[in-house]
Amino acid sequence: MSTRTASAGDIKEGSYIMIDNMPCRVVEVEKSKTGKHGSAKARIVGIGVIDGVKRTIVVPTDAAVEVPVIEKFTAQVISISGDSVQLMDLRNYQTFEIPSSYIEDEAKGKLEPGVQVEVWDVAGYKKIMRTR
């Protein structure tokens, strides 16, 4: 699981952060003003990249948050079974399986053996994002 740290005040909409140990794409950021006895807070709302679940985190703007390192690579579909897809990584020719729940909706109908797909490896999770 490769991550780096960033300040919560520097997070923008469209970026990616880890919320509850799941990689999420940030869809909303609200920053409150500094109070009389406290620091400014950031309310960050994200949608899970892997599972699509909406998650919220409230942290001080100077707090460090984890930002996942997203590795994108091309793979070829070898076979499709009922609940998983077997792929071959075109960089090193290793085979691996991805559950059907980790396939983006727009790519589900286009999968067949021999098709090349773009795979995202985020925090140890692999997900098929689109066909090539």
From Swiss-Prot:
What's in the GO CC field? Answer: cytoplasm
Instruction: Enumerate the PROSITE patterns for this protein.
Output: IF5A_HYPUSINE
- Keywords assigned by UniProt? Cytoplasm, Hypusine, Initiation factor, Protein biosynthesis
Q: Sorted alphabetically, which InterPro entries does this protein's record hold?
A: IF5A-like, IF5A-like_N, NA-bd_OB-fold, Rib_uL2_dom2, Trans_elong_IF5A_hypusine_site, Transl_elong_IF5A_arc, Transl_elong_IF5A_C, Translation_prot_SH3-like_sf
The answer to whether keyword Nucleotide-binding applies is no
Please state where this protein is localized: Cytoplasm
User: PTM Hypusine: at which residues?
Assistant: 36
Superkingdom of the source species = Archaea
Q: Which family does it belong to?
A: Belongs to the eIF-5A family.
Provide the function of this protein.
Answer: Functions by promoting the formation of the first peptide bond.
- Its protein name is Translation initiation factor 5A
Question: Which taxonomic lineage does the organism of this UniProt entry have?
Answer: Archaea, Thermoproteota, Thermoprotei, Thermoproteales, Thermoproteaceae
Gene behind the chain:
eIF5A
